[in-house]
């Protein structure tokens, strides 16, 4: 655990008692803070009591006694309207921050205390609309394979303050969501990665411009930034940072760049003043299939280069990466049919890489639709043999598909798996794919995308060989 000592003897309000909230409370308490925690969900309050964390309804506390509100990233800060606890903190004129900010301040204190520089305890922060978890996991994997002391956490699922404490040469690889960045005003990573920017979480940010601005804060604060230049918003941001004198390099999975990193098919290159150097070839790596994974690998390799880390066995290290659960995860193969779990694809842009990577697709899609639905995926419709529509979005998606290809109103995931398996087994193509890439949030039928993905795996494993 990373203990937070700079609130020692001071009273701190904490709201949000999920896994990261509980960990944050323990980190504050271990550092001597007087913590009062609360959550609108009774199960969170019960969890706090089980861990001996003081939990009282913050609506009835004297807010003039608090010096800060530590807020869970899932709690509305601004849009669609501030949560009542945010209003309370603003009325009391106290700072509102999250666990990433606590980590940043604790690291800064450690560096100052021991006279270390930024590079002595590298902090790599990774963000983007899609792909950030894979890039985070891949980078941490490569560092581990090469024998480095690495800690991985943040939005990827491991609460950042549960990581091992700071020591010299320990490397922190941290995934950051836009909500977490909003709550981290001092965020200044050693290296900042921005993978892509497409509309997402607009209900929480109010507009795409506000969403972009949140992501921008991560790379503008970085000592060294790498920005993908394959979408319009990132291109604008890259040029802006370059003009402002930031140390920033371009990364592209689609085209050559004069200075930076790019992919030519499965081959990855670094480029300096127009001269290129081959870094790796992903051709035989199943877990890194698709152009989106070329981008993820480029970002990881760019980071290693910035850290001045080289290894002659890089292809071997890349090949040993097994991929993330629920992200283009091969669950089973029955004859020529692959069953792919891509439950983490919670919007159309996140589904695009899987649709691009495969052919002869029997597509299970649907859930709670995001803005614009699957309209942006029309360019992949020629690859789809049939779709199986589930959840609240089924009727909307049926309208978008129209007569482009056959579809079934399966409604439930269990129905969809059985129907898709039967149809796919009849297909005579060399490789056939039952692809569960919902392009939707899970909340209409499942608690989260992980539970949804586990349900898919369970249904697939129950299928009987024919």
From Swiss-Prot:
Binding residue positions for ATP: 128-134
Major enzyme class: ligase
One Gene Ontology cellular component: cytoplasm
SS bond list: none
Alphabetically ordered keywords of this record: ATP-binding, Cell cycle, Cell division, Cell shape, Cell wall biogenesis/degradation, Cytoplasm, Ligase, Nucleotide-binding, Peptidoglycan synthesis
Coiled-coil intervals: none
Protein name listed in UniProt: UDP-N-acetylmuramoylalanine--D-glutamate ligase
Organism ancestry: Bacteria, Pseudomonadati, Pseudomonadota, Alphaproteobacteria, Hyphomicrobiales
Gene coding for it: murD
